[in-house]
Amino acid sequence: MVLNPSKYQDTRTWKMTPAMIRARKPFFKGNMLGLTLLLGVTGSVYYYTYHFLHKDNDFADVPIPPIDPQELEALKKEYEAKKKA
């Protein structure tokens, strides 16, 4: 498939013509502002999500009641019995 030459591109080098560059010039700042805003919002969402999900949440503030050694042995035996079955 052969590309049809555009009147806004030089047919030999495929670069934009000066007319096309002049036509795009007024929109450059707005486009860059929009791009910056879009990337900023996207980056902020990813940053917030990453740091929110990677918090150290190891339940350190939950007190663990002490366990009696006899209860611990009974629980170990129960665990081993379930493991074998």
UniProtKB/Swiss-Prot annotation:
Mitochondrial matrix side: 1-26
Record's keyword annotation contains Lipoprotein: no
Keyword Disulfide bond applies: no
Primary subcellular site in the record, as a coarse category: mitochondrion
Superkingdom as given in the UniProt entry: Eukaryota
UniProt topology in membrane: Single-pass membrane protein
Keywords: Membrane, Mitochondrion, Mitochondrion inner membrane, Transmembrane, Transmembrane helix
Mitochondrial intermembrane compartment spans: 50-85
Transmembrane segments: 27-49
Location relative to the cell: Mitochondrion inner membrane
Subunit structure and binding partners: Component of 250-400 kDa complexes called cytochrome oxidase assembly intermediates or COA complexes composed at least COA3, COX14, COX5A, SHY1 and SSC1. Interacts with COX1 and MSS51.
Family membership noted in the UniProt record: Belongs to the COA3 family.
PANTHER family in the cross-refs: CYTOCHROME C OXIDASE ASSEMBLY FACTOR 3 HOMOLOG, MITOCHONDRIAL (PTHR15642:SF3), CYTOCHROME C OXIDASE ASSEMBLY FACTOR 3, MITOCHONDRIAL (PTHR15642)
Other known facts: Present with 2530 molecules/cell in log phase SD medium.
Known function: Required for assembly of cytochrome c oxidase (complex IV). With COX14, negatively regulates COX1 translation and is involved in MSS51 association with newly synthesized COX1.
Protein name from the UniProt record: Cytochrome c oxidase assembly factor 3, mitochondrial
Organism this protein belongs to: Saccharomyces cerevisiae (strain ATCC 204508 / S288c)
Higher taxonomy: Eukaryota, Fungi, Dikarya, Ascomycota, Saccharomycotina
Gene giving rise to this polypeptide: COA3
